[in-house]
Structures are given as structure tokens and as C-alpha cells.
Amino acid sequence: MAEPEESREPRGIRLQKVLSQAGIASRRAAEKMIVDGRVEVDGHVVTELGTRVDPQVAVVRVDGARVVLDESLVYLALNKPRGMHSTMSDDRGRPCIGDLIERKVRGTKKLFHVGRLDADTEGLMLLTNDGELAHRLMHPSHEVPKTYLATVTGSVPRGLGRTLRAGIELDDGPAFVDDFAVVDAIPGKTLVRVTLHEGRNRIVRRLLAAAGFPVEALVRTDIGAVSLGKQRPGSVRALRSNEIGQLYQAVGL
């Protein structure tokens, strides 16, 4: 015998509760977002507070940025120290990021690392078990920008930024920067900020060396919307909801 309609449990979870649990906003603030038309479910703007969704299958966006609802997904920012290899394991016994995070994060074998760095370069790397996001972030077609602070030998001339934006021919083809700025200078050394979206091996070091300014120290500070901030070398933190959403947006997810 069929169960009476009025006695059936409503399917799904209230949308404002889902947003609150995802860390987007408090329940009350989430309700206002819905009423204001800032929330989409599966491509449609939702303004009804009684809307229920299944977090396992629904695609929810706030202000156009996707909200991650799958609690099994992990998104981390690591400040890789200098001298450590960008691998989860190393068969030669060299220090690697897998050694660093296994003490802090469970399930490290399932994590993909995004934004590989040379052993002698420090700075921001992303770690996630979201394979689709990791793949897209690493694919050059999505052109996710990465920013570095480089200490170079010598005094940088005023026109170097223009030269780097125009492009320099390297052994494996031309390379360009998206942005370049001098941050600080002392006699014999200059600190510069470089932003580019490609990820060829040692591209920043090779590009600056080809321009006549060998790199003495290099730190990656940003990948897309995620910034290193005040993270200490060796530290790991969970990405904030807005950071994850902006990464999704950057790669068209």
C-alpha cells in the first residue's frame, strides 16, 4: 500500500542549511543570499527558502562561484620549504612533501599536488583529492596565473618588464610574463614580482636568466585566487570556501 503523500519525508536538505554547512555564510545570511537571487542550483536561480537539494548531486553556485558540497573532498595549501622535492614519495630517500604532510593530513596517498616546484624553490603548492579540478588547474589551456617573488643578481633596468611581456626565446620556445614589477632593491640584488600562467620546467629561473638576471632565491606566492599570505614554510592549511569556488570558476567547473 502506498504511503500517504503527507507522511513522506521531504527529500534533500534545505538549501540554506547546505550553504551554512559548506562554510559560505550563517544560516540567516544564506537565507538572504537565496532571497536576493544570488544562489543557483543546477544552473537555475533559486529564491525560495523551502528549496531542498541533494548535496551529493546538486551543483550549487553563489555569485557564480561553485560551492563544494562533497565533504570527502580535501583542498589544502602548502608552503613548500626550500630543499624539499614536490612528490608524495621518493624512492631515493630524499625529503619530499609526502613526508611533510603525512604527519598532518590523513589519506595523503590519494592527494594530487598542483603546481610542482623545484627542490630549490619554495612557496605555494595546492593538494587535493579532487581529480577533475587538479587536472584542469595543471592544464595550460586554462591559463591559471601563478605569481612569484624572485631575488635576482644585479640592478634591474626600467624596461625589463616590457621585454619580458613581449617574450624571450628559450630553448623550448618563447616565454612571456603576464605581469612584472620591481618590489625592492639593494646594491647588487633586486626583488621582483613575476606573474605568468605557463608551467614549463624552471620557467621563471630560465626566463630571468635569459634576460641577464640569474635568480638567487625564488618563492611562489599565488596560484589563481589562492595566496600564500603569512603561511610559514612547512605549514599546511585548508582552503577557504571562497578560494575553492574561485578555483572552480577559473577552470570552468
Regions found by a protein language model. Give the residues of each.
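Basic, flexible Lys/Arg- and Gly-enriched helix-loop patches that mediate nucleic-acid binding at interfaces
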Residues: A2-L253
